[in-house]
Regions:
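Small-residue (G/A/S/T)-rich helix-start motifs and N-terminal tracts that mark the onset
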Residues: 1-133, 142-159, 164-297
Length: 297
């Protein structure tokens, strides 16, 4: 299988126009985080901000707001009412979410939401309303796997980012079967799925239709809870900025892995954390900008 290259990724990011503003780089709506998992919300939000989205709106539980707002100053927060167990529910937040969905350039749903009926209802309603690229991760994927009727409403601008376990649930098979033949699993799924699939793992596969490519960056130190939240935020930010779903997925996978490689070199594979990827993203994008400048000279 062909591999992504640094040259290809650099081509996705032209020089920013001096006469630009935050609207130029898109509005990303993140529907993320239950009371139990504010960290997933924080990681995906910071990743989106570090990846250049013009405006990041975060729909998360009221209890999460003091935690997030005291650490992440650049996001706009939409406080969500919750179920008794602290998960976002559609019914209590429909008016706010409907308005936010209309204004979004891309939507990320799933990170830290919780795998319950409330999340399934939330996803079902978002799918019915969203027109822009929709990135589904984590519990968004678990909700999708539990609601076949949602999958029947699929659109070409959907991006799914499953790890092998989530892929198994989406495909109705086992994790072992997915890992035994990852390229075939991705190809078979995309015969029925019209969007872009990002099958995470060693050699992440990005597939859309019959087009597939593998990511060469990344390392075992990234095998920690939270790394996927960073990836989801990056892909969503690129989609909000106008990259096609496939290109956004390719850029996200490659640059996420590169940040992981930088983090491993700095902190070691053993000790590195997902938040260290965020610390390394400026270095990643600086490398990209320096490469672009060198070509222009």
């Amino acid at each position: 299988m062909q591999e992504l290259s640094w040259k290809t990724i650099c081509g996705y990011f032209p020089k920013r126009n001096r006469n630009s503003h935050k609207g130029t780089f898109g509005t990303l709506l993140c529907i993320t985080g239950s009371n139990r998992m504010p960290g997933a919300c924080a990681l995906s939000t910071l990743a989106a901000l570090r990846s250049g989205a013009g405006l990041v709106k975060v729909a998360t539980t009221e209890r999460n707001l003091p935690i997030l707002a005291s650490q992440i100053y650049e996001a706009v927060y939409l406080p969500m009412q919750t179920t008794k167990i602290g998960e976002i529910c559609w019914e209590k937040n429909a008016v706010v979410l409907q308005s936010a969905l209309k204004q979004a350039s891309a939507v990320l749903i799933g990170c830290g939401l919780g795998n319950t009926a409330a999340t399934q209802e939330l996803l079902r309603n978002v799918v019915n309303l969203v027109e822009c690229p929709l990135i589904m991760d984590a519990d968004g994927l678990n909700a999708l796997a539990s609601c076949i009727d949602i999958m029947q409403k699929q659109k070409p601008n959907w991006i799914l980012t499953p790890h092998p376990g989530e892929m198994a649930r989406l495909s109705g098979t086992t994790t072992a079967a997915v890992q035994a033949n990852r390229p075939q699993c991705a190809a078979e799924f995309c015969k029925q799925f019209s969007g872009t699939l990002v099958l995470k793992g060693a050699g992440t596969i990005i597939q859309q239709g019959t087009t597939a490519i593998q990511n060469p960056t990344g390392n075992p130190g990234m095998s920690r809870g939270g790394s996927g939240d960073v990836l989801a935020g990056m892909i969503a930010a690129f989609a909000a900025q106008g990259l096609s779903p496939y290109d956004a997925a390719c850029a996200g996978a490659y640059l996420h892995g590169l940040a992981g490689d930088f983090a491993a070199a700095r902190y070691s594979e053993q000790a590195m954390l997902p938040q260290d990827l965020l610390h390394c993203l400026p270095e990643v994008f600086l490398k990209l900008e320096q490469e672009r400048t060198a070509k222009e000279q």
